[in-house]
Amino acid sequence: ACSSSAGYSFRAVLGPCTGAVVVDCIEGLTGTLSDGTSVAGVFKQYFPLQGVTDFVGSPSEGVPSGGPPSLWTLAGAPHGFGNDYEVTVEVVGSKKNGDALTPTRSFFASVTPVSLFQTACDVRYNGHCMDTYREEVGLNGKTTIGFAGVAADQDAGIRCVNWGENGKCALKHAFPAGVKFALKVRLSTSPSGWLHGRMQDPVASIDRVNNVTTINIAANPTKVPIISGVGQWAVLPTAIQESFTAKCANVRCGTRQPQEAQGGYLTMSVADRNIIFGPSAFSTEAFEQIKLWTGFLKDTASAMPSQWSVRTLGDSEMQRAPSCIKSGVGVTGIVATNASAYSEGPPTFDPVTSSLNYKVAALHFEKDGVTPFKGQYNLILRSDIANCLYGVSDSTKEASVSVTGEDGVAKAATTAFTYNNGWFSFSAKGFTHSAPIIKVKLTSPQNDVKRLSQVKKGTITNKAKLIVLSGLKYKSTSRWFVQVSTPNICRVTGTGVKNLKAGSCKLVVYVTPKVSKTVPKPKTVSARISLKVS
C-alpha cells in the first residue's frame, strides 16, 4: 500500500481462507474433469514465501492484507509438468478524503499451471534473475537449460510467472485438456462494473450475505493468439513503414530512450531507430496494427498460450458504456473472448437494431500456419440490466446471437442462449476472423407491448403520458428515462418524446425506485410502448 496524509492506495494480493482469516481470502480452487469428477485444490504454500511488499490491512476501513500469490495442488488434475497451480487474486483500491470504502475497487483473479524450477541465479550478483526459459543442445550433444531476459511478470505469463527465494522460478505451462476450473473468493466489499475474462463458457455467481461477498467463477481455460512481428526497415511493407513514420516522427515510440528524450535522438530518421509498438488489446490501435501486419506475418499467430483470468474493467474502459450498465449496482455483466484484440469496455448498445455489439480481431491461423483459429465469445448479462436495455422480462425466451464479418456477410458460428438464476447467458463459437462483430439481441413477444397510442406528427408526448401508457408504478423519488429504437420516426427531447413523422414510434420506459435501507439494490423495471404517429 502507498500512503500520504491525504489518503492512500493499495493493491492487495489475497491468500487462502483460514480459521483466523475468514474474509478477503480465497475459499477454494476446484478442477472438474471431463467425466464430471470434482478435484478439490489444497493450499500448498505462498510463492515466494514472503513478498517484498506484504502489508497488514485495516478491517475497520475494509482494506485487506496483502501478501504473495499462492500455490495450490490439484492432485487429480495434473498438467504436463506436475499438479501445482498458482492462484493470484488482487483487490485494488484507495482511501480518499478519509473514506476507503466508497471509492471504486478493482478485482483480478487468475489461475496458472506452474512448476517450480531451481535456477543458478543469485540475486546478490545478478540484481534481477533472468527469466526466459530455454533448452539448448551444446556442441557436446548434451542438453542445457538457460535463462535470459529481464525478470518481469509480463508478456501474458509466457516467461516465469514470478520468482521465489534462492533463485526458484515458477514456470508457466499449458492447462490440461478437458478440465474446468472454479475459483471461490470471499470479499468484504463488492466489486462493481463489468468483468472481462480470458476464459471459455464462464458460469458466475456473486452473492452478498452478512456483509460478505462470495464470488464463484467456473470456466474452461482458453487459448489466446499472440501477435508479434519484427523486421528490418527495408523489408517491412510500405503500409507499415508509413504507419511508423506518421506515428513516430519526433516521438519516442517504445524504445529504451526516455519519454523526454531530446535532440538528435528524436530528429533521427525513423528508419534508423529501434521502434516498438505494443498497443493495448482493447485499443483502436490494436485493430489497426493487426490489419497492417497481417500480410507480413502470413496471417499466423506467433504463440497460443492458454489463460484463465478475469478482471474488472477500468474507468477509462467504461466511459462509453451504455447508461443502463454504468448506473447499475455491483457487477452488471461479464464478457469473455479469446481474440487478440477486442472492443474497449462492455458491448455497445445499438438502439436502431436493439443489439449489444462487440468487435474482436485476430489472425486467421494458429501458430502452425495451417490450423484455422476459431473464435469464442461469451456474454453474461444480469437480468435487471437486460431489462433496462431491452425492456424484457426474466421469462423472455427469444434471443439471437449473430457474427458478421467486416464485409457485412454473416459468418458461420455455433450460438447458444440460456437464462439461470437472474443472469442471461449468450455464446458464439467456431467463427473465423479477421475482425468480426458479434451482435446479441433479446426480444419479447408482441404481447409485451404495454399500450398503443395515437399521436400527431410534430407533437411531444410528455413524461406524464409516457408513465401512464407504461403502466409502471412511479414515485417522485424514482429515477426514470426513455429509450427510442426508431430515431427516424421519433426522438427523445427533454423529458418527453418528439414525434417527427408518420410511422410507428417504438420506445421503452424505465423506472428505478430510490435506494433505501429496505431496498438497497432496487430493480429497474421497464415497459415497451408503441406510438402510432400520423
Where are these regions (language model features)?
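Long, leucine/valine-rich, helix-dominated scaffolding and oligomerization segments
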Residues: 1-333
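Proteolytic processing hotspots in large secreted/extracellular or virion-associated proteins
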Residues: 338-400
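Exposed aromatic-hydrophobic patches
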Residues: 376-390, 423-430, 469, 493-498
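Short proline/glycine-enriched turn/loop motifs at strand-loop junctions of beta-rich domains
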Residues: 393-398, 406-409, 473-479
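Solvent-exposed serine/threonine-rich low-complexity stretches and specific carbohydrate-binding patches
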Residues: 409-422
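C-terminal beta-strand-rich structural cap/linker in extracellular carbohydrate-active enzymes
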Residues: 424-446
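Extracytoplasmic soluble-region selector
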Residues: 447-534
